Structures are given as C-alpha cells and as structure tokens.
Amino acid sequence: MVQDSAFLAKLMKSADTFELKYDFSCELYRLSTYSAFPRGVPVSERSLARAGFYYTGANDKVKCFCCGLMLDNWKQGDSPMEKHRKLYPSCNFVQTLNPANSLEASPRPSLPSTAMSTMPLSFASSENTGYFSGSYSSFPSDPVNFRANQDCPALSTSPYHFAMNTEKARLLTYETWPLSFLSPAKLAKAGFYYIGPGDRVACFACDGKLSNWERKDDAMSEHQRHFPSCPFLKDLGQSASRYTVSNLSMQTHAARIRTFSNWPSSALVHSQELASAGFYYTGHSDDVKCFCCDGGLRCWESGDDPWVEHAKWFPRCEYLLRIKGQEFVSQVQAGYPHLLEQLLSTSDSPEDENADAAIVHFGPGESSEDVVMMSTPVVKAALEMGFSRSLVRQTVQWQILATGENYRTVSDLVIGLLDAEDEMREEQMEQAAEEEESDDLALIRKNKMVLFQHLTCVTPMLYCLLSARAITEQECNAVKQKPHTLQASTLIDTVLAKGNTAATSFRNSLREIDPALYRDIFVQQDIRSLPTDDIAALPMEEQLRKLQEERMCKVCMDREVSIVFIPCGHLVVCKDCAPSLRKCPICRGTIKGTVRTFLS
C-alpha cells in the first residue's frame, strides 16, 4: 500500500503540499500496488501502472482500474499500453491518452514552481488529471503531466467482465484447454472464457459457470439452458444469423435503445422495456416496431407489458419465440381466444363488394369498419389504379392487423398490393404444378411434415434410391453430410425436386424398408379420402380410428389439433407444431395468422 512504499514516503515528505488521492485513478497509487510484484516478470511496474493497471496480488496478473481488463503471463517484448489499446480500445482511460505521449516522447510541458506547490496530484481538469509520466528520482523537482480519466467509473461490482467482451480475448484464455471434442472457438463464441480447473468456463456477461462437458453438449444451447437471462444471450438472440430479421440495423439492444432518444416523456411505457422486447422507436407519436417480425404497436397504456403485447399481436415472431418461448406465447394467446375470430370468418365467407362492411376488432375498445378503411384517399387512389376491391381490402386488413394502422402513402399500398399479387401468383403456380404431379408425388408433398418427423431409416432409403438411379451419388452424399436431424427433410426435399420418377422410387423403397410408415403415407390415404357418406359402411374400429385421426395433429401424429390457420381455416396441427410451419400442410396456402381453438 501507499503507506508501505519508501518512494512515496520520501515523495510526500519532500512535497507536503501535495494531496495524494488514494484510488486507482492515480498512477502513483497504482504503482504502489506493485511492492510484491514478481521480480522475474519481463515488463516494468512503471509501464504497467502508466497503462492503467494495478497489481491484483496473484502471480503477474494486473487489472485496469477503468475498464476492468485483466492481463497476465507477460512475455519479453510485451507493451502494456499496446495490449491495453488492442484488447479494449473502448476503455475510457485508453481513449484519453495520446499515443505519442510516453516517457520517451517529446519533452513534457513545464509547470511554474508556484503551480507545483499548490496543485494537488489528483487535480482534475478536462486535460490533466492523475497521469504521472515523470521519473522516480526527479519527481519532486520535475513537472508532472496530467491527463483526464474522471469519466472512468469506479471498480464495478457487475459480473460483466469487460476484459472478455470480445470473442478474440476469450479465445486466448484456452491455451491449456483439456478437451478435444469441444472446441474453444465454440465456447468463446457462446460467451465463455476458460477459468479452470478442469473444463470449467465462465460467461463474461452473466458470470455463469459450467463444467463437466460431454460430447453431445452444444456450448450455446447449454448457456441458454442454464442462464436464460444472460444479457449476452439476449443480444445474441437478436442476431440475424439465428433467424430472419426484418431490420438488420436494429438487431442489437443498444441500437434499439438509441432510437428512443426522442421518446415522448408522456409515454406510459419505459423505453428499456420496449427495446428488450425487440421494439425500436419509429420517431412518430408512440409508434414502435419489432426489428424481427416488423410488427408495429402504438397507443400504449399504463400497465401495458411490451412482451405480452408482442405475444398477443405477433405470436409467430421468431425473436419473441426464441427469447420468451412457446409456452409464454401460448399463455398470452389463451387469454385472447377471439382476437382473430372475426377476421377468420371474413376470410372464409364469399366476398360481396356491395355488402355492408365488416368490423375487424383489434383490441378492447378499438375497431375499424371496412367502409371507413376503404374510404381513405390512399385506398381510393389504389382502387382508381385498377386494383380489385377484394385484393385491396384483404391487403389493407392485413396491414392494420400487423401494424395497427392503415397505409399512409399510395406507394406503400401499391408495394403491398404488388407483393400480394406475386404471392397469389406463386400459390397458383404451385397449385398448377401439384395438379400435374403423380399421386405418389402429391402424397409425399402433402405428408412432408409427417415424413420429416417419422422417417428414421434415411441411409437405407438413400442406397435404394441410388441403386434405382432416382438420385445421383452427389445428391446422396449431400444428404449424408447433413446433421442427423436434417437428413430426412433434405431427402424429402430432394425427392420432391426430382419429380414423379423419384417419388415412385421413394414409394417402392419405403414399402420395403418401413412398411408401417408406408401404410400411413400411401395405403391409408384411400380410407382417408372416402366420402363422409361412406364412413358408416366402415367397420366400427375403423370409424373410431378415423374420428381419432381427425383430431390428431397431422405433423407429430401425437397431440390433439388446436390451431386454425388463417386465411385457409384448416384445423390440422397442435399448438406445439404450428410455429414451425409457414404453409398449411393441407392446402399449401401461406399461413398469415393463427387462432387457438379448444375442442369439446
């Protein structure tokens, strides 16, 4: 400590008027911590202190007083300042230093002797405070050069390890990593740095520690499972590499929070809560949008929970599902069972342009009549361009459902209408292609999700298809190189792309290799397609089986159906399988919304 330093004792004796500040922002105080620093370290204590480091007392490990960066294992030729600047360039202390100013740099500015007798060592100004660059022996008579670091926080009590906030810094800690089956690169990418003993690692953000790794473990998955509230995971959860993102520039929490600089002071929901829930501020009123699903919300009220509103209006948002989970979304949806009911009935009923406009409900106390919705200048302009009224109505309804407001400009509406037309054209082309398909290909396409889940004998199927020349050796290898969980889906997609001949070979191969699955996909279709009038002619057991099958999820073939797809209205999957689908497995129509149902 300072009191035990002979040099500092001499200094204070010869410069009684100096007020020495006892904290690590003072270089002299940092220097005093090196009294027990190991003698064999090839880096001088003075250069370490000058670079912002104080001695921790453990081996040759030092720590920056400002950013918390910890370094050890010093080697010949190491420059503390350069390593500090390289590993943590955003450190406030590093940023305040002029790289040209060092002990060997240009001569230091002199201070008048009168100033020397009155200026405290911890003197703070915008340019000079607490940065000592004089020599030991000449300090009492030589001037002192000061630099600003008052912006640096005190030593943080947060678990966040600033030193390890880059993947590169974390990777450097795995020099003695003992395991071969789990790569340091994956651990570092998942936020972990190595602390030992054994295979023990810690997260730089939440300080969560894990050990006893097994071969099947995935670093990122284990991190999420054990420490779901980790701030690093929350930001990572917003990464575009994990799911489709509507606005890439808003994928980080920091980017979203910056948009709230002009957030109305009268707003009833805190900006931090909105940013955490994936929303960024559009700059208008209290309108916010999700960076992932592009869903918009407005008119916030006291007590509103951004996560609940997100799950209420946009239950299929991938960011929402990743962060909060399907169970949370299902609970929220269960509280609003009739939210999309009227929209569904509107989609299923025939369009009558002369009929009275329907009312689409968007929340308690909020409604919008079609007659008003279709009377705005923007909508009228689109109608005058020749777009069909039914297409305009449907497009505007979905815009209001997704964002809570009508189109503001004609150009935006026209873009939406053109996209809707492209989507309709694509669906028509798919439907036409399916009509030309053989029965085998149509059945494989229709039951694709069932095959994804239940086709386990992929390798034998590959060899059968290869010997029948239904697929090429290159296509066979492409399937085998996929992870085990993706091989079935890749094989089915390959067969569907190859066409009728490959589908026939697939059917014949499946009959030999998995007769039970073959019956479910191909044989039982004859019974399923019987007219309703003919069911009574079936045996009682078959009637019961058919009734049970009607209530069974067509994807997992296990749980009861409970989700109605919008706009097609098909009720064919359970609440657990619905989020993974983008098109209805029955009609192949694009799923634009879902409604939870409860069968009695």
Swiss-Prot record:
One of its GO terms (cellular component) is nucleus. USP19 regulates the stability of BIRC3/c-IAP2 by preventing its ubiquitination. SUPFAM superfamilies: DEATH domain, Inhibitor of apoptosis (IAP) repeat. Its main location: cytoplasm. BIR repeats lie at residues 27-94, 167-233, 253-320. PROSITE patterns: BIR_REPEAT_1, BIR_REPEAT_2, CARD, ZF_RING_2. Auto-ubiquitinated and degraded by the proteasome in apoptotic cells. Zn(2+) binds at residues 290, 293, 310, 317. It is found in: Cytoplasm; Nucleus. GO terms for molecular function: transferase activity; zinc ion binding. It comes from the Eukaryota. Coiled coil: none annotated. Residues 436-525 form the CARD domain. Multi-functional protein which regulates not only caspases and apoptosis, but also modulates inflammatory signaling and immunity, mitogenic kinase signaling and cell proliferation, as well as cell invasion and metastasis. Acts as an E3 ubiquitin-protein ligase regulating NF-kappa-B signaling and regulates both canonical and non-canonical NF-kappa-B signaling by acting in opposite directions: acts as a positive regulator of the canonical pathway and suppresses constitutive activation of non-canonical NF-kappa-B signaling. Interacts with PRSS25; the interaction inhibits apoptotic suppressor activity. The BIR motifs region interacts with TNF receptor associated factors 1 and 2 (TRAF1 and TRAF2) to form a heteromeric complex, which is then recruited to the tumor necrosis factor receptor 2 (TNFR2). Interaction with TRAF2 is required for ubiquitination of IKBKE, degradation of NFKBIA and activation of NF-kappa-B. Interacts with RIP1, RIP2, RIP3, RIP4 and USP19. This is Baculoviral IAP repeat-containing protein 3. It comes from Mus musculus (Mouse).
